[in-house]
Structures are given as structure tokens and as C-alpha cells.
């Protein structure tokens, strides 16, 4: 297995892997995400490629000048539980470290306990921050979240539950 920047011939396979792994959402275009990552100077899509030149895993890594970020870490289902996810994260950390960025982070949906456990096992910890977002495209009408603040946001900001 070798880890290297994703070759163009495997772009479609990477998008399929992300879809098969449940990483895509209707409001995010994974093909556009991939194109932006590989064409930007501050990001890259890394690939684990097998001896048969097939795609085994991916991770999108980049930085904003202050923090490194990881997205789309996906391992082919037939390759899971063999240490490949850990190897991909180590490659992402090396990529970020080589750019003298002092911190790397990622986002995981709170309901995805298995994935949270994977990252905790690698030494990652909850940063105890609230991530807020706003759509700037035509997809802003998609209901991304309930209209009331989540329990976690209410707790963090010490806002009482309006339903109570």
C-alpha cells in the first residue's frame, strides 16, 4: 500500500467511496469538493493505493493558515480494521506538519459514536466548541437544522429550553 496525492484517474472512485461510506450529504457536492481540494494550493486529497493500483482509502487534508483540517477520511469496507485509517490520519498529520501548521482538527457528527471513538483512540479530543455555519449558495433553503438551538448550544450558551 502506498499513500500519495489522489491521481486523476481515481477521482470517480474516490467520490464513490465517499458515497458508499455515507460521507456525502445532499447539500454538498463531493465532486466539486474534490475539484476545489486538488486545485487549491492549501489542500490535497491523499489516497491509499493498493498493489493492484486500486483505491483503498482517501482523506482530504488542508489548512487555513492557522489549523489543519481533515475531511472525507474513508476506507473501503473490505480494507477496514487493518490500520489503514490510522495510516491515513498519520499521512494527514505529516502533510499539515510539513507546512508548519501547529494544530489539526476535524468534524464528526455527534451521533457517529464509532467514528468519534476511532479518533479518540488516535489521541483526538473534543475541542468543546460549537460549530456554526451558514449556506451561501442556492441550497440554503434545505432544512439543515431545527429552527431552535440544539441542546448542546443551549447548554453552552446557558439558554433555557424554550419547550420546558
Locations of the language-model features?
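Short secondary-structure transition/capping segments
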Residues: 38-39, 116-118, 139-141
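N-terminal beta-strand motif that seeds the catalytic metal site of vicinal oxygen chelate
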Residues: 108, 137-140
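Extreme N-terminal starter segment of soluble prokaryotic enzymes
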Residues: 1-2
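Short, charged, solvent-exposed linker or helix-capping segments at domain edges/interfaces
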Residues: 141-149
